[in-house]
Design a protein with these regions (language model features):
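A conserved FAD-binding loop/helix module that cradles the flavin
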Residues: 246, 260-323, 409-431
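Beta1-alpha1 glycine-rich phosphate/pyrophosphate-binding loop at the start
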Residues: 1-54, 138, 146-168
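Glycine-rich Rossmann-fold phosphate-binding loop(s) that bind the pyrophosphate
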Residues: 113-114, 134-139
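A Rossmann-like FAD-binding core segment of flavoenzymes
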Residues: 7-9, 51-75, 82, 150-246
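Flexible, glycine-rich terminal cap/loop adjacent to redox cofactors
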Residues: 2-6, 15, 223, 316-317, ...
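Hydrophobic Val/Ile/Leu positions in short beta-strands of Rossmann-like dinucleotide-binding domains
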Residues: 12, 111, 132-133
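FAD-site-proximal beta/loop scaffold in flavoenzymes
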Residues: 105-128, 203, 213-289, 388
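Rossmann-like dinucleotide-binding cores of NAD(P)H-dependent redox enzymes
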Residues: 40, 140-195, 281-283, 299-325
Length: 435
């Protein structure tokens, strides 16, 4: 906003003691890659002030009056009222606390969200011997991998029957689970945690599910996030689970009030609907769109595909768009093709494979989603599939799309060409390449 209007009076209220903490970097801190949590901040109080922003830390917005255009802020036990011309809300999300008996009763029961929790987890890792991580999504496997690498006997427990079930299809997660087991990380799927018990010192000792009991001196819950919007009830329109209702210009139901981040939906590119996709990349785009519209310069939030990538032990993977598990919910005829392909020509004496899947409409051949995985870092190629989805490409277009060839990196038919060709059943000789 300041680039558009250098005289704008911008007040930022942050409930934490430091702004812009990147929770996605917690694993690097737990594994001693990042030496300090201070490294995991996208911005600082000083950097905000240097740009002319009035930043207020340890300040929680507790009330909103859209008629009089004011917010109430609590800081160190004192409250103050601020007026606004335009307001942007980004209350974010908070860890879901599942209905588990004993979850708030015992020591060493942790959540992986935010700077304070990161400190507690790192401190606990010094003494932990046996951990249970509840939740097999991105956050759960990041914590579990860090525990396992630290020599902690770690088990992931999830209600789903496989890890990362909302991100990757079974062909990929089967490989990841086997590889994780080889690194000492165990997975127990299809189980619901019912209770936690502990000893007379108030320390957790056991996790009880509907099927088993697991000894544990440390338990970490990572079962998702939910919008932190209770204080906005009856102030602006909220949807299911407290998600803030917005249009594609980031406007809420109240005049001059905009919103973005983990408390909102984003327009989904593969199909015409809005979805809850809590990613930092989406939040940044929403911030730009909101700022433009707040300044009277109309801009619409682009459709996104929920593109993301991660690493679990030996494998790097990326995913975007629709998954094969959505076949029953897709309004059409959903097709999916899984392919394993050598990355380089055989004469390079390198048998590294890439595992790939493409999701598409069987009738129109429009590409709707994709997944890639390898021991080599090919995750950036998922960005290509994301662009393809947004551009409305068909299998026929991707099958012959222009990619460079250099034997150090790929083959004459790029692996994404091969993926689309295999889906079409028209391989142009790519299935019989001698190199």
């Amino acid at each position: 906003m300041l680039k558009e209007d250098e005289n704008a009076d911008i007040q930022v209220f942050e409930s934490a003691d430091q702004p812009s903490f990147l929770s996605c970097g917690i694993q690097s801190y737990l594994e001693d890659i990042s030496s300090s949590l201070d490294d995991l901040h996208y911005a600082s109080v000083d950097s905000y002030k240097a740009q002319g922003v009035n930043i207020h830390t340890n300040s929680t917005v507790t009330d909103l009056d859209t008629d009089n255009k004011t917010v109430v802020v609590e800081h160190q036990g004192q409250t103050a009222t601020y007026s606004y011309d335009k307001l942007f809300l980004s209350p974010g999300g908070k860890p879901v606390t599942p209905p588990v008996d004993g979850i708030e009763k015992y020591k060493h029961v942790l959540f992986m969200r935010g700077r304070d929790w990161a400190n507690q987890i790192k401190e606990r890792m010094k003494d932990a011997k046996k951990a249970v991580v509840v939740g097999g999504g991105y956050i759960g496997i990041e914590a579990a991998e860090a525990f396992a690498k630290a020599g902690i006997d770690t088990t992931i427990v999830d209600v789903a029957d496989r890890i990362l079930n909302t991100y990757l299809d079974k062909e990929f997660t089967d490989i990841l689970e086997t590889n994780a087991q080889q690194h000492g990380l165990h997975f127990k799927g299809g189980e619901t945690v019912k209770s936690i018990s502990g000893n007379q010192n108030g320390e957790v000792t056991t996790v009880v599910t509907d099927k088993n009991e697991y000894d544990a001196d440390t338990v970490l819950f990572a079962v998702g996030v939910e919008p932190a919007t209770e204080w906005l009830k009856d102030k602006i329109d909220l949807g299911k689970k407290g998600i803030i209702n917005i249009n594609h210009q980031q406007q809420t139901s109240a005049k001059d009030v905009y919103a973005g981040g983990d408390a909102t939906l984003v327009p989904f590119a593969p199909v015409s609907e809005d979805r809850y996709i809590a990613l930092a990349t989406n939040s940044r785009r929403q911030g730009v769109v909101a700022a433009k519209n707040m300044l009277g310069k109309e801009m619409t939030m682009p459709r996104v595909s929920g593109t993301s990538g991660l690493q679990l032990f030996d494998y790097k993977f990326g995913q975007t768009g629709i998954h094969g598990t959505e076949i029953d919910n897709y309004d059409g005829n959903l097709g999916q093709t899984y392919v394993e392909e050598l990355i380089r020509p055989q004469f390079m004496q390198d048998d590294t494979k890439i595992h790939m899947k493409i999701i598409y409409d069987k009738d129109t051949h429009r590409i709707l989603g994709g997944q890639v995985m390898s021991k080599e870092d090919i995750t950036a190629s998922i960005n290509t599939i994301s662009v393809v989805i947004s551009a409305g490409f068909t299998l026929e277009q991707l099958a012959v799309q222009d990619f460079f060839f250099q034997p150090d990196y790929d083959r004459p038919w790029h692996y994404l060409n091969v993926l689309a060709q295999q889906a079409l059943g028209d391989t142009f000789g790519s299935d019989k390449m001698l190199f």
